[in-house]
UniProtKB/Swiss-Prot annotation:
Biological role stated in the UniProt entry: Demethylates proteins that have been reversibly carboxymethylated. Demethylates the phosphatase PP2A catalytic subunit.
Molecular-function GO terms, alphabetical: protein C-terminal methylesterase activity
One family name in Pfam for this protein: Abhydrolase_1
Keywords linked to the UniProt accession: Hydrolase, Serine esterase
Listed name of the protein: Protein phosphatase methylesterase 1
Tagged with keyword Hydrolase: yes
Domain of life from the UniProt record: Eukaryota
Assigned EC number: 3.1.1.89
Reaction catalyzed: [phosphatase 2A protein]-C-terminal L-leucine methyl ester + H2O = [phosphatase 2A protein]-C-terminal L-leucine + methanol + H(+)
Hydrolase listed as a keyword: yes
AB hydrolase-1 domain location: 100-332
Length: 390
């Protein structure tokens, strides 16, 4: 470990402890870190089961559909005239224009419902004058209930263009006056960062960029394990419970069954004798090398025109590259690390939605209302540039 990295770790220990979170490890195990991303323990391919528990299967389906409708009352299709791709979107409006809106982008192989429990937790944690934030999300092309092109194109440039279309369309459909925070998990964080780089002078009211559990160097190294994982993951499941059990008990991709009851069914399509994946991850392989290259530098430098605040939230002890270390020490972004490997994995928004919500609400309040935040947290509002009286 470099001296710069040690100095960095020492600096943030007190900051993270003060926030009630686990600190970065001083001697991270790089191989363990990489496994958090894309390389859960591969399992032998499943044969299609015929012993479906129809009652259990139907109950999970009903819970999934009811929860999705309750959390996201607005579910629209946005069709991009340039590509013909139909994007499934979900929107939970804020209580008023005084509450923020989170625009969320999921990662590869995931879907919008990875943010469902987070949306519920944000309502519980925001709790200011009976207000609650909004949350908008959409299924990336070829994921969830969105379509894709033939031949498929999952390059970062293309899915960034998709993101630009979605955000423009979202603003056109809704008279937005709330402050907006962009929130991306894994590949979604790279897409939103790329969007800000490509649109430095946009007129939207972006206040912050939040990236969940992605570090450029670690992600690029972890991609080497993806082909084996994609080949060896089950191709079919007998019912929803079997799929949930695989995500939690076998692959350890997820750690919360409550969240998995909504997020996992959204990944699967029912066929006559079971369930198959909606997303063909093998089709994305030719584009993997485009996804994360330059992410750290772009994250540090994007959004300067709008003075966009930035937050990086990690599930465990990642080895940060020099750009991220220097950027954090210079105060260019806030870093939060959750280091409880028994309860958290790569999908931290699903595993610990309450803790993530607390972190997001704190980030929003210090950026939306800094004077009010300082007064509440520290009992005073600093008068920068004024005289200090004894």
């Amino acid at each position: 470990m470099s001296g710069l990295h040690k100095q960095f770790l020492k600096k943030i220990k007190e900051q993270e402890r003060a926030f009630g979170l686990s600190s970065l490890s001083e001697d991270p195990d790089e191989s363990e870190s990489n496994s958090n991303y894309f390389s859960p323990t591969p399992q032998p391919p499943n044969e299609l089961r015929t012993d479906i528990n129809e009652e259990r299967h139907g109950h999970i389906r009903e819970t999934y559909n009811d929860t999705k409708r309750d959390v996201f009352p607005i579910a629209d299709i946005y069709t991009d005239p340039r590509s013909g791709v139909r994007f499934q979107t979900y929107f939970k409006p804020p209580s008023s224009s005084n509450a923020p809106i989170f625009i969320c982008h999921h990662g590869a192989g995931s879907s919008s419902m990875t943010f469902c429990k987070l949306a519920q937790s944000l309502d519980n944690e925001y709790g200011k004058n009976n207000e609650y934030p909004g949350l908008f999300t959409y299924d990336m092309r070829g994921h969830g209930d969105s379509s894709t092109t033939i031949p498929p194109d999952y390059s970062l440039a293309t899915i960034t263009n998709d993101c630009e279309f979605i955000i423009d369309e979202f603003h056109a459909k809704h008279a937005l006056r709330s402050s907006i925070y962009l929130l991306g998990h894994s590949l979604g964080g790279s897409v939103l960062t790329s969007y800000l780089v490509a649109n430095p002078d946009n007129a939207y009211k972006f206040k912050g960029l939040i990236v969940l559990d992605i570090v450029e160097e670690t992600a690029i190294k972890a991609l080497s394990a993806m082909p084996q994982f994609v080949r060896k993951r089950p191709t079919t499941f007998g019912d929803y419970q079997e799929a949930i059990d695989w995500h939690i008990k076998e692959s350890h991709l997820l750690h919360s069954e409550e969240s998995a009851l909504v997020s996992v069914p959204d990944l699967l399509r029912e066929c006559p004798n079971g369930l198959i994946w909606k997303t063909n991850l093998q089709e994305t392989e030719p584009f993997w090398e485009t996804w994360f290259t330059g992410l750290s530098e772009n994250f540090i430098n994007c959004g300067k025109t709008q003075h966009i605040a930035k937050l990086l939230v990690l599930s465990g002890h990642e080895t940060l590259d020099t750009n991220l270390i220097i950027g954090q020490m210079q105060g260019k972004y806030q870093l939060i690390v959750f280091n409880n490997t028994q309860n958290t994995g790569h999908f931290i928004q699903e595993d610990i939605p309450t803790q993530i919500s607390i972190s997001l609400v704190d980030f929003v309040r210090r950026n939306d209302s800094p004077n009010e935040y300082m007064k509440k947290e520290f009992g005073f509002v600093p008068k920068w540039g004024g005289k200090i009286h004894d």
